[in-house]
Swiss-Prot record:
<dbReference type="InterPro" id="IPR006203">
    <property type="entry name" value="GHMP_knse_ATP-bd_CS"/>
</dbReference>
<keyword id="KW-0547">Nucleotide-binding</keyword>
<dbReference type="GO" id="GO:0006012">
    <property type="term" value="P:galactose metabolic process"/>
</dbReference>
<protein>
    <recommendedName>
        <fullName>Galactokinase</fullName>
        <ecNumber>2.7.1.6</ecNumber>
    </recommendedName>
</protein>
<dbReference type="GO" id="GO:0005524">
    <property type="term" value="F:ATP binding"/>
</dbReference>
<dbReference type="InterPro" id="IPR014721">
    <property type="entry name" value="Ribsml_uS5_D2-typ_fold_subgr"/>
</dbReference>
<keyword id="KW-0460">Magnesium</keyword>
<comment type="similarity">
    <text>Belongs to the GHMP kinase family. GalK subfamily.</text>
</comment>
<keyword id="KW-0299">Galactose metabolism</keyword>
<dbReference type="GO" id="GO:0005829">
    <property type="term" value="C:cytosol"/>
</dbReference>
<comment type="pathway">
    <text>Carbohydrate metabolism; galactose metabolism.</text>
</comment>
<feature type="site" description="Transition state stabilizer">
    <location>
        <position position="27"/>
    </location>
</feature>
<keyword id="KW-0067">ATP-binding</keyword>
<comment type="function">
    <text>Catalyzes the transfer of the gamma-phosphate of ATP to D-galactose to form alpha-D-galactose-1-phosphate (Gal-1-P).</text>
</comment>
<dbReference type="InterPro" id="IPR019741">
    <property type="entry name" value="Galactokinase_CS"/>
</dbReference>
<dbReference type="InterPro" id="IPR006206">
    <property type="entry name" value="Mevalonate/galactokinase"/>
</dbReference>
<dbReference type="GO" id="GO:0004335">
    <property type="term" value="F:galactokinase activity"/>
</dbReference>
Length: 387
């Protein structure tokens, strides 16, 4: 259905059939939260929700773009000769940013495109709708102009667009998880070295349920910066006593030796989270390789508790979802995912219990919070593809 709407919208706006259809996923992080900047591992995977596109190559230097998610904006038009950021160009700044970065890197792009997109990722929910769009655009341009961009380079290009063009200080995880995504696999990634490893994620009779608090992450940025500073300060203190360059180089056992050097109790708890979370990621990967989904679920639960009690980034909404999820039959594990303070939580739920799970957790959330959460059943999909 979505593809038919996409095609008909393309024909209505541009008077012809599109050359090609494309899809780019969103992502979740299964475990390994708030440790990418502490030298730790993240463990994301692409999901079957994402951004769809219909696109055609033009024979001039004009780009025309229309989004079914922002219909009131109509068709936004610009030329390859002016790729400067303009606030009024809204979401198409991502298209302009990717074009600008690619052209500056010497890729030959000499014609414009017509583009219609439609995403089914909720905006502002922490499922990486912007990285999904960036990787979609790279895929389209790579296909149309035969640019031969590697998957790792595609991720780095997306990060550069975010950092230098859009002006968001994001890391590499989102673009990497999407660009290198493979069906039924998660990616163990060290964001500093870009070392990565695919880990098969066979969920058997279970699905991933994404639970959206429907609370925008308005606190996330200020608290995120605060947490980073607390970790950086702690690292500076520990460096006086041990030769490390990041918190996650320490094991919990090693940290026991030095923890009395951190006098501030808040900073101490931040360290405890970072170091224990990195160990949980390694344990989670081992559990999956041994097909031990039960242990994997328990580690997810422990991760949420650590983020709630030691890192203090969950908040009432995410806690309500996770804590009610734990009580339901057929649940292997549940935790917040992303930056916290709103956004989404995830649960791994037996397929026979999914409907009951959504009904029970949804009702408990509405009773406690006063408005509804949204639920999405997702599986682990491929990276950006031409359909």
């Amino acid at each position: 259905m979505e593809l038919n709407t996409l095609k008909s919208t393309f024909i209505n706006n541009f008077g012809k059939e599109p050359n090609s259809l494309f899809f780019s996923p969103g992502r979740i992080n299964l475990i390994g939260e708030h440790i990418d900047y502490n030298g730790g591992f993240v463990f994301p995977c692409p999901i079957t929700l994402g951004t769809f596109a219909a696109a055609s190559l033009r024979d001039d230097r004009i780009c025309r773009a229309y989004s079914l998610n922002f219909e009131s904006l109509g068709v936004i038009e610009f030329s390859l000769d002016d790729l400067s950021y303009k606030k009024e160009d809204n979401w198409t700044n991502y298209l302009k940013g990717v074009l600008k970065v690619l052209i500056e890197k010497g890729y030959k792009i000499d014609k414009g495109i017509d583009l219609v997109i439609n995403g089914n990722l909720p905006n502002g929910a922490g499922l990486s709708s912007s990285a999904s769009l960036e990787m979609l655009i790279v895929k389209i341009l790579d296909t149309f102009f035969s640019l031969n961009i590697s998957k790792v380079d595609a991720a780095l290009i997306g990060k550069e667009v975010e950092n230098t063009y859009i002006g968001v200080n994001s890391g590499i995880m989102d673009q990497f998880a999407i660009s290198l995504g493979e069906k039924d696999k998660a990616i163990l990634l060290d964001c500093n070295s870009l070392y990565y490893e695919y880990v098969p994620l066979n969920l058997g009779d279970n699905s991933i349920i994404i639970m959206n608090t429907n609370k925008r992450r308005e606190l996330a940025d200020s608290k995120y910066n605060e947490r980073r500073k607390e970790c950086d300060d702690s690292l500076d203190t520990l460096k006086k006593y041990t030769n490390i360059s990041s918190l996650c180089e320490l094991t919990s056992l090693e940290f026991e030796t030095y923890k009395d050097k951190i006098e501030d109790s808040n900073k101490l708890r931040r360290c405890v989270h970072a170091i224990s979370e990195n160990e949980r990621v390694k344990d989670a990967v081992k559990a999956l390789k041994e097909n031990n989904l039960e242990l994997f679920g328990q580690l997810m639960n422990q991760s949420h508790i650590s983020l709630r009690d030691d890192y203090e980034v969950t908040g009432k909404e995410l806690d309500t979802l996770a804590e009610n999820a734990w009580k339901q039959p057929g649940v292997l594990g549940a935790r917040m995912t992303g930056a916290g303070f709103g956004g989404c939580a995830i649960a791994i739920v037996n397929n026979a219990h999914v409907d009951e799970f959504i009904k029970n957790v949804g009702q408990a959330y509405k009773d406690a919070i006063g408005y509804e959460a949204s639920f999405y059943v997702a599986s682990i999909g491929n990276g950006p593809t031409e359909l």
